[in-house]
Amino acid sequence: MQEQYRPEEIESKVQLHWDEKRTFEVTEDESKEKYYCLSMLPYPSGRLHMGHVRNYTIGDVIARYQRMLGKNVLQPIGWDAFGLPAEGAAVKNNTAPAPWTYDNIAYMKNQLKMLGFGYDWSRELATCTPEYYRWEQKFFTELYKKGLVYKKTSAVNWCPNDQTVLANEQVIDGCCWRCDTKVERKEIPQWFIKITAYADELLNDLDKLDHWPDTVKTMQRNWIGRSEGVEITFNVNDYDNTLTVYTTRPDTFMGCTYLAVAAGHPLAQKAAENNPELAAFIDECRNTKVAEAEMATMEKKGVDTGFKAVHPLTGEEIPVWAANFVLMEYGTGAVMAVPGHDQRDYEFASKYGLNIKPVILAADGSEPDLSQQALTEKGVLFNSGEFNGLDHEAAFNAIADKLTAMGVGERKVNYRLRDWGVSRQRYWGAPIPMVTLEDGTVMPTPDDQLPVILPEDVVMDGITSPIKADPEWAKTTVNGMPALRETDTFDTFMESSWYYARYTCPQYKEGMLDSEAANYWLPVDIYIGGIEHAIMHLLYFRFFHKLMRDAGMVNSDEPAKQLLCQGMVLADAFYYVGENGERNWVSPVDAIVERDEKGRIVKAKDAAGHELVYTGMSKMSKSKNNGIDPQVMVERYGADTVRLFMMFASPADMTLEWQESGVEGANRFLKRVWKLVYEHTAKGDVAALNVDALTEDQKALRRDVHKTIAKVTDDIGRRQTFNTAIAAIMELMNKLAKAPTDGEQDRALMQEALLAVVRMLNPFTPHICFTLWQELKGEGDIDNAPWPVADEKAMVEDSTLVVVQVNGKVRAKITVPVDATEEQVRERAGQEHLVAKYLDGVTVRKVIYVPGKLLNLVVG
C-alpha cells in the first residue's frame, strides 16, 4: 500500500473496475427486496454544476447504503434532452440542436462517471430519441381516443422574441424568463390534456404521501385549489345573454354592487362596438400577463361597459365593468364584486367611485368601518333583508338554497387547476401526433405512422421552427387522403412525466412499459430533486402515473413513496461597478479577500485591482458568475473529497454554503483515514479478536465503535441526517487515532474498527473505501459487502455515572459498576472528599436513590 493518498490514481482505477464488472447493473429479482432510488434527470446543458453534484451525491449515498443492506437497488440516470436552450445554442454555434445535445450528453456522462456515481448505465435514456418519444406519442393518441385530449383556442403568454408560448411560471415581472422580452397575450389553438378530470384524486391522494415534504403538498393543494361555492346567473338589460359568476362567499351576495368581465368577454366586445374608450382598453389588455402572481400586483384598471345587470335577489340594477383582473380562461370570464368584503373589489370600487355596501358585521357586532379597507373576515349578516342575523355557514346555505330554488343558482365545486396546455411552437421537442385531413377532420396519427420523427438534420434561423418553415414536412397521407401533420411539439414536461417508469424497461419494444418490470420496481422508493419543481413537474409526474395506471400499465396510485428536496448550493458573490454603471460580477475563485478574526469577509479585490462589493452568499448562478466548476474541484481534491464535503457541510434539505476551506477539511480527513489504515496494515497480519479477553480501555473503545455504527445506521437509514453520520465517524476516527496499537488485541480491535469505518464511509467516499477495503483484506469487493451491524452486547455500559447530592446540592459525580447496589454506591460516595466533608459529624436522616443516576443524602 502506498503511503500517500493519491485520489487521481485510485479513483480512475476504481471507476474502470465498476465499468468492467458492470457492478451497478440490476435485473428484477423476486428473492430480494427492491429499492428504487432516483434523482431528477438532468438537462444536458453542457457541464454539470454544483446543484447537480449535490442532488446526485445524495442519491448515490442512499443507493449505496441500501445496496449494503442487501437490497436489489436500481439507480438509473438519463437526459431530459428536449427544450429551448438547445435551439438558442444551435443558432449561436451554427449547428443543429441534435448534435449539440448529443455532444453535451457525452461530456456530462464522463463528468458523472468521474464523480463515481453508481448508476445502471445499461438503462440510460435520452428523451429526444424516437425510441423514447414514440411511446409518448402513442399514449397521447390513446388519451385522445379516451376523450382526455382536446384542442381549443386559448389566450397564452407569448414571447415575441422566442416565438413561443410561456407557462405562467415562465413569466417573470411581465417578461420572458429566458430572454427578458416583454410578454404579450395572444389567442392560438392549442392541445390540452384534461388534468382537471383527475383534480380530486390528485388532491385527495396527497394524504397518502406521508414521506413527502409538507411544503410540497401544501403548494400542490393550493395549486389545485379546490373550492366549494355557488354559480349564479344574472340577467343583463339590453343584452341577449345572461352572465354567470362563481363565488365561494354567497353569504356576502346582498353586498354585490357591480360585476366585472374580462376584456375578451363577448359582452365587453359588444359594448366596445360603440365605445372607443372601452375598445382601447380591450386592446391594452391584450398585452397583460396571464400569470396570477403578476395579476395580483399589477394596477387594477377597468372601463364601464354601459350594461346593467339585475341582482336576482334585490332586483337592483348594478353596473357591468370590463376589468383587467378578470381572465376569460378562469371560470366564466365574469366575477361578482362585493367591495365591502373583498379588498381587490374595494380598491377598484374606491378608484372608480362605485357603490360599497357592507353586509357583514364586525367581530364586536358593530357596523364595519370601511373608510380604509374592506372587512374580509366572516361574520353575522346585516343589511341583507331576510338573511339578517345569520352566521357565515347558515347564510351560505340559505342564500345558496334560495338561488337554487329560483333557478338562478347552483352549488358547484371549482378548481384553480387548469387543463395542461401541451402545445409548444418550437422545433426541438417531440412532434404532437395529430393530423388534419383534407376535409378538415382532425384525428390521431395512425399507429403504423408512429413515431412521427423529428428531423434532426436541420438549419436553425433562430426565428421559425424548421418543421413549420418546411411545408413538405407536414404533408402525409392517411387512409388514402392527403393530410397535414401538426407542427407544434410537446411541452418538455411531457417527457419528464414518465421517464422514471421507462427506466424499468428501457429496451422494451412492445409498448410504453413492460408491466411486469414496472410493477416490480415501482413506485420509486425515494425521489430526489429541487423544491422548485413542486407544482409543475411533480404534479404532472403524479398525473401521468395515474394515467398509466388507468391504462393498465402500473398497479400503484402514486409514482414515488418519498420525496427529498435538496437545498440550494450557495457561494460568495462579488461585483464591481464598471464605467457604464453596470455591475460586473467576479467569480469567487478570482476574488482576493481579507477576513476579520471571525472569518468574515471585510474587503475584496480582483487581480486587476478593482475594489469588489461583497453581496454575501447567494445561489450559484450564471447571472452572478458565482458558480464553482465541479470538475476543477474534482481535479484538485478528488471526487471523494467533493462528495464528502457536499454531504457534511449541511443537512441535505438545507442550503449548502460552498467554502473551499471546508473542502480542504474534508480532504485532510480522508488523508487521516488513509494514514491510519496505512500504519495499521504496515504492521502485518492481525490475530482474531477475542472479546472476552479485552481490557476495560479496549472494551470502552469497542463500545464507541459499535455505538457509532448504531448512530450512523440510524442517521443514514431513518433520519437521513447524513452530516451527523459523518460527524460521528469523524469523532470515532479521532479516538482510533489515539488508541494504542502495540498489543495483539489492540491491533485486532483496530482491524474490526477500521473495517467498520471503511464500510460506513463507503456510501459517501466509495473510491477510497474500495481501495482501503482491499488493503484491510476485507472479503470480496466492498460493493458487495454487507453494512456493519452494531453488537448490542458491546454497547452495554459496564459502568455508569451517578450524581451525589447532599441536601439537594451536587457534591460529586462518581463512576460505579452498572449492577452496583445502593449500599455499594453509598460506600463509594463516602470515599469522595467533598461528600465526606458534608457528612462529618451529622446524621443521615433520609436517602433518596435513583438507580444508576442519583444519590441524594438528606442530613441534619
From Swiss-Prot:
Signal peptide: none annotated. It holds the Pfam family Anticodon_1. A motif ('HIGH' region) lies at residues 42-52. Coiled coil: none annotated. It is found in: Cytoplasm. One of its GO terms (cellular component) is cytosol. One of its GO terms (molecular function) is ATP binding. Its main location: cytoplasm. A motif ('KMSKS' region) lies at residues 619-623. It comes from the Bacteria. Keywords: Aminoacyl-tRNA synthetase, ATP-binding, Cytoplasm, Ligase, Nucleotide-binding, Protein biosynthesis. Its EC number is 6.1.1.4. One of its GO terms (biological process) is leucyl-tRNA aminoacylation. Gene3D superfamilies: 2.20.28.290, 3.10.20.590, HUPs, Isoleucyl-tRNA Synthetase, Domain 1. The keyword Isomerase does not apply. It catalyses: tRNA(Leu) + L-leucine + ATP = L-leucyl-tRNA(Leu) + AMP + diphosphate. ATP binds at K622. Belongs to the class-I aminoacyl-tRNA synthetase family. NCBIfam families: leuS_bact. This is Leucine--tRNA ligase.
